[in-house]
């Protein structure tokens, strides 16, 4: 499987910073690693890894089975037990009853799952795995609204049938980057190649001829699919003028011939999929392991949740992942961690643990879900976050690890690593702010580095702000700075490159970071004005009709959350501020 990607990679780093396992497992099983969006600023950089599927599964299993106090039962849940609006347990298909103080539902695509290949339909949660029945209906009986969504997966190909010489190669990166902040985490597997090629007009012609048998276009599938990961048939219909679409061929592991064709998700009949692919020169002799297919499944309206991911309707019942209308491992993992933390807090007492929009992409994700809801599968992008510069991949540990440590989730070793990094960054930045540079001593070096010589003395930090200058290339010409860097990173030499990169980002982007932090702090004042349960919105005639309807449905916690609800205007917010005595 692929882990990470644009914005998703930041979520995995946040999960790791909070003490989660996804980053560690991904590093351990990565067979290709890349940083995406390198040509843009560091707020947009996102790690992505292709993992060995078999090793990924076993690594996760090993971690789960060796987690203290975690007990595993293999079965299918068919009913929740609810008393007086509070979940108290569940029943499985084997007739086993579990009593519980809290339950976290993470059913993925399995609730009433139905797979489609052409006109063929097959019940299931994914290929060769049965769907889960009865559970949706059990939950809906208590007044929780649900709907249907659709996702898809591409064909799997036998590598022995591919003409790799007719494709472009895409190599991984072997530098210091990884997902986990832990210095014990390493990427030790051999980096494998991926390949790219393109569809053509002949491919599109065959796909178009198959559209009458496509469940997406013949009415067989009514549910909504992901806008930003469309099927190949959706691409050719939506973009009829586009002559080609890029395809990525990705290995499934070190020791398997199975390849994953990213960019060719489809639910067309199998013969159409094969015939179309044979028109791509590299695939002219293609042999497949299985066709692409679409899957429909149930999800629950996430506006029925609190920011803790606890249901507003059934106390102590939490929802996480695709059952909330999201796509992807990363979004699911982030939600699962927050739901799990809050389920524990509900059992043992304490304040709900939530993340704000300026703290984490996970905070943006959950706030979007519970405030705006979903009408299509939700995928995280950097563009969904208004504080991108504050939510960079390099500083997830600085944002979140201390909070996780005080919760008891991040261990002492993780916390100490974060503190060591923080001290090193402060030492480097303070030295750069205070060290004076003289033109006579540095101008020759500046000219060699392709930047303007100094006319008068300045602080080192001013030179570091120039685009041609990096910490490493200027340190070669400033021995005192080189010594300071060695001293600052001596306690964490394994992560020296990571610390230097983070320091350079802090120095070059400090003005933008400060400005974004100031905007976030202004909006935080609205976050402090609690309004949940204060108003009978339906009776406030000075609100617009749409605002009244939306506010009744969402029942926001704060003025700030109310301001993010689609259909609630600034004038509606002013009405609420006046009624709040502000």
Language model regions located:
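Glycine-rich phosphate/pyrophosphate-binding beta-alpha loops
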Residues: 322-330, 386-388
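A glycine-rich dinucleotide-binding beta-alpha-beta segment and adjacent secondary-structure elements
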Residues: 260-326, 354-367, 485, 496-550, ...
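Core beta-strand elements of the Rossmann-like FAD/NAD(P) dinucleotide-binding domain
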Residues: 93-102
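Internal hydrophobic alpha-helix adjacent to the cofactor/substrate pocket in enzyme cavities
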Residues: 15, 332-355
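Conserved N-terminal/central alpha/beta ligand/cofactor-binding core
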Residues: 1-79, 94, 106-123, 130-136, ...
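An anion/pyrophosphate-binding glycine-rich loop and adjacent beta-alpha core
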Residues: 8, 137-274, 362, 371-456, ...
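Glycine-/small-residue-rich beta->alpha transition segments that form the dinucleotide
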Residues: 102, 107-111, 268-269, 281
